[in-house]
Amino acid sequence: MKRIVVDIETTLGHKTIWLCCTKDIDTGEKHTWYQAKAFQEYIADATLLIGHNLISFDAYHLNSLWKTKIVLNKCYDTLLVSRLLSPSLEGGHSLAAWGNTLHTQKIDYKATWQWLVGRREDYKGECYDKPHMGLLAVYCERDIDVTALLYHHLVAETEAQKFSQESVELEHTVAAIMSKQERNGFKLDIPYATVLLTTVKGRLDSIYESMQERWPPYTVERVSEKTGKPLK
């Protein structure tokens, strides 16, 4: 068994992967990868890849930019499972929120970058387009530490709350479909949709008229207590 926590750091527009950090949750072994080939070889025999927002972000961009072949049935997305277990979790489901809960806080990368370079960003996200690579690696490594802790917590909670493996898998399947729709959109039969809209509006008008006939509107006359005259 080889279960690996994965986290990537990219440019603001996600066109380039700067680095990828991994952690074997069974051995504790960590790596920071800067090249696709070595990373591809490392995860080739992984039985499980774990990440926070793994399906919509990390796995998608790794497959697109580093040409990995990450498949859905080998993914465990801690963000999805967190939402499954507690949809209205106080504080939210972000890795930063979980870091506070698990007493292993995320690093404030932006603030630290600004301190290191001695200025504020010229535009939002500049710290990712022009990263301090040493800081970025440390930041990413902390993220995989938090994600590893969160994975163990969620596995225990899933068992304690008696959530089935089927429910977890279904959540991942639906998330993969939704993520694809968000990126590519979806086809819509516009002529049919237009006809359907007209039909529904006609039906609503008919229902409204029937309700007016059954419960006709009436006016309540208000009278002034002082003068006894009708109020306008």
Which positions does each model-derived feature cover?
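A general structural motif
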Residues: 1, 45-47
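Conserved "right-hand" nucleotidyltransferase catalytic core of DNA-directed polymerases
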Residues: 1-14, 101, 117-232
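Short alpha-helical segments and helix-capping/turn motifs at coil-helix boundaries
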Residues: 6, 35-38
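Active-site-proximal helix-loop-helix substrate-binding element of RNase H-like nuclease domains
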Residues: 14-18, 22, 28-34, 47-158, ...
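Detector for glycine-centered tight turns/loop "hinges" at secondary-structure junctions
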Residues: 27-28, 228
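Short amphipathic alpha-helix with an adjacent loop that forms part of the alpha/beta core around
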Residues: 37-45
